[in-house]
Amino acid sequence: MSLEEKKKPESKEKDKALSLVLGQIERNFGRGSIMRLGDASRMKVETISTGALTLDLALGGGYPKGRVVEVYGPESSGKTTLTLHAIAEVQKNGGVAAFVDAEHALDPVYAASLGVDVENLLVSQPDTGEMALEIVDQLIRSSAVDLVVVDSVAALTPRAEIEGEMGDHVIGSQARLMSQAMRKITGNIGKSGCTVIFLNQLRLKIGVTYGNPETTTGGNALKFYASVRLDIRRIQTLKRGTEEYGIRAKVKVAKNKVAPPFRIAEFDILFGKGISTTGCLLDLAEETNIIIRRGAWYSYEGENIGQGRDNTIIWLDQNLEIRNKVESMVKEKLTEGTEVSSNSMKALNSNPANTIAVNDIKTVA
């Protein structure tokens, strides 16, 4: 008897044993408790748009559904604005969003100006960190909410700290709270398909001479459990003469489990208006040579359309038919795998293979 003939009965016995154990696991723990990865119905990670085309591209489509996302950065860098745009995108597509306002600082007028349906936005202003995270867990387990934003981790104050005296030291209480919460809610997030975005603040490590002294609050648990971590910074103040009208923000994808990490996206945030979607479109149109810049002038199909970036954005906003045509052409070029390499997507320069094809991305919101 050949070696192959000897192996065949062993293989059949293994397959039979595997079928028996899989059946036993499903009877004990329910259907879907174990499966072959190729049989999984959710192999492709769906995404929620960030509201900024350049950032969607850097993330591989947007915020992944059913995952934890952390957005951190210094004060006034655009963290809350970024998440309010995500809420607006979810609502635009008929989804339900919730905002857990631990900082008690949500401005409904500003949120409405960014396109948020404030009448239907679920808002909670919890008294303690435990209360906030319990509310988050219950919203996730309902499977009726598509996006939950927690603003912010630094404001999730443990009950022991609130009930104690002002000078009391409750060492590590917030880190323990976050660690327990992440263990509890992560599994539920994956099952429900709800995206949870935690906003976080920066602190400085004491006594650090070499390396980056910055760290985020709430311990290390969130860093491990987050599928995506975004580092957002203000890099420029936008001015017309002496009047400041917005900021230029840079976002580095510090961690990404669903697409290549370390990409960088830049976009404008206008005071009172939020992310400049037309500005993002102009950046990508210029990079894909749909709109050509020569000196201060921008041209489209051989005709000058604006002198300076601001005037070109205004022209595109006023000529919606051409704007929509440019947007379609940009998406088509990205679908073809055209390399995008300039200030807004610097991280793609090092490897053209990193360019994301839009047809490989499934965006649902």
UniProtKB/Swiss-Prot annotation:
A GO molecular-function descriptor: ATP binding
A UniProt-annotated Pfam family: RecA
GO term, biological process aspect, one: DNA recombination
Keywords: ATP-binding, Cytoplasm, DNA damage, DNA recombination, DNA repair, DNA-binding, Nucleotide-binding, SOS response
Residues the entry annotates as binding ATP: G73, P74, E75, S76, S77, G78, K79, T80
UniProt cross-references to InterPro entries, sorted A to Z: AAA+_ATPase, DNA_recomb/repair_RecA, DNA_recomb/repair_RecA_CS, P-loop_NTPase, RecA-like_C, RecA-like_N, RecA_ATP-bd, RecA_C_sf
SMART domains in UniProt: AAA
Intracellular or extracellular location(s): Cytoplasm
Gene3D superfamilies: P-loop containing nucleotide triphosphate hydrolases
HAMAP family, sorted: RecA
Function recorded in the entry: Can catalyze the hydrolysis of ATP in the presence of single-stranded DNA, the ATP-dependent uptake of single-stranded DNA by duplex DNA, and the ATP-dependent hybridization of homologous single-stranded DNAs. It interacts with LexA causing its activation and leading to its autocatalytic cleavage.
The protein's name: Protein RecA
Organism: Prochlorococcus marinus (strain MIT 9312)
